[in-house]
């Protein structure tokens, strides 16, 4: 490798010449239901999207995740302190990927409680009011009954989220929450933690408390090796979150992982730790 300073008149061209053949090889090595994650900074993310659209196909774009790589501002910055970094995800064949999920976290479960001592356990709730108006969704407009105050309720402008038959089922299943004394103007629909299947849909904003920071990664390596050796190491927590994503319900415990730029061996560390935690047989 040779340095590619931004003073070079071919700065972006040289970078593209470096990354293009590597991504071609990456695609050829991916399984049909495989995915690739690429960490990149703001300097080249726009170029990388174009290259990936060409190599993998625009339709195989999965997500552009925003990773919070640090949480403290730098007063040495002249304009803005960069706290985040893009993380691109592409699939080899998007039709082979029906869903991507991740395991539920303690943070996600913490929103569930049981203020009314429901025998079904902890729950959270969602609004019953539809953003659409009655004119837009006339089939979702009908009167509701508040059993606590014994009053009929209708929304002045908006429809409900559910058809009347579904509402009647919610009533039979005692899923509507009107408040402790019926004080809510409109009901909320109960969602029970016990009904969750232990997984959730991932979001495209990854906070540092869940995925680590570059500063912590550097400290971990320095503590391990006795001195600073790498400038842009990724935290193992970030890689572990990537590897923990479940594609089509598969936890990927026997997955084969390839890191094209394995400088500090963070990917190897993450693979070995995950295997130790869940008994997997991942290889790298």
Predicted regions span which residues?
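Class I S-adenosyl-L-methionine-dependent methyltransferase module
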Residues: 277-284
